[in-house]
Amino acid sequence: MRILTFTGKGGVGKTSVSAATAVRLSEMGHRTLVLSTDPAHSLSDSFNIQLGAEPTKIKENLHAIEVNPYVDLKQNWHSVQKYYTRIFMAQGVSGVMADEMTILPGMEELFSLLRIKRYKSAGLYDALVLDTAPTGETLRLLSLPDTLSWGMKAVKNVNKYIVRPLSKPLSKMSDKIAYYIPPEDAIESVDQVFDELEDIREILTDNVKSTVRLVMNAEKMSIKETMRALTYLNLYGFKVDMVLVNKLLDAQENSGYLEKWKGIQQKYLGEIEEGFSPLPVKKLKMYDQEIVGVKSLEVFAHDIYGDTDPSGMMYDEPPIKFVRQGDVYEVQLKLMFANPVDIDVWVTGDELFVQIGNQRKIITLPVSLTGLEPGDAVFKDKWLHIPFDLEKQGQHHRTREYNKA
């Protein structure tokens, strides 16, 4: 299943672009689902059709859905929520407050992500278009698998080696202890969610099937936010294959009051094309009417893609590479707009940590690099190069063997 994720600053028109892309995919024979994770529910407005928490048919080959996070939360977390609510209420916390305390930050977005795996496994669709919330929320959404990975491992180990083996013996010792032992279905729910989250990470970072497309306007704030988004998306291993600049005024038409705005847009457009190169930049005009309903979206889709299949790969370069040159192994990350001063790199065990500001990526290293300290990272041509000298590792290994002898 081809997955296309659209994101951008609020108000740039990403929902219209997402909906138009889905319409064009369906016209080309792809069984398409467009899914909105934006709580604003703009997708219903775009199609001018009321959408619900399950896929609604728009036309042939096209369904749409607006995720209701509370429905998903109840389906996936009910047994866990019930257990913790009981514990909190035993400590004197009121029922409503106890319910709220069982929902961890990011849980609503997490269960929106889990739908992706389920739709992929069902095999009902050829293409999935994700219409996401504004950039900041999207980055939090897409980075959840990485952000929670360490905690997932810890909780799963606690469940496997402590909770499961001890729950039955301890529950038999006294009723008070038994009261605090989590039921089997709650433990299984936690394990299942964490397992699926690992699968989601693999699906979204599959650079053959899944890409992100950035929607922006030719305005300073929109450009800056899109630059940050591209940097962080690349950091987390998401391939970006296209930039769409929306709501451009006609540079040829004399528009009086808007003449100054046209000049501003043309100036920023040059900066966008230069700064985001070699990514393809698609320029989209400002329409003289609202883009609402399937007919309007069909016209918009043709302006975006023409006769091109939207499911095609518009730019094909992975954001993370492992390159070996002689005895030097390099981990390379494409970080187009990162400030080298803000980048921090370190290794713990078999994991490479790369941090930019408050965003952190954990990369599992090949076995041959485990325990080897990285050399000095170099930022060159929009790529961060992190070297590992295999010869030094060999010398270190030989020294250890000699000392043992």
From Swiss-Prot:
GO terms for molecular function: ATP binding; ATP hydrolysis activity; ATPase-coupled arsenite transmembrane transporter activity. ATP binds at residues 8-15. Disulfide bonds: none annotated. CDD domains: ArsA (cd02035). Keywords: Arsenical resistance, ATP-binding, Nucleotide-binding, Translocase. It holds the Pfam family ArsA_ATPase. It comes from the Bacteria. Its EC number is 7.3.2.7. It catalyses: arsenite(in) + ATP + H2O = arsenite(out) + ADP + phosphate + H(+). The keyword Translocase applies. Belongs to the arsA ATPase family. Anion-transporting ATPase. Catalyzes the extrusion of arsenite. This is Putative arsenical pump-driving ATPase. It comes from Chlorobaculum tepidum (strain ATCC 49652 / DSM 12025 / NBRC 103806 / TLS) (Chlorobium tepidum).
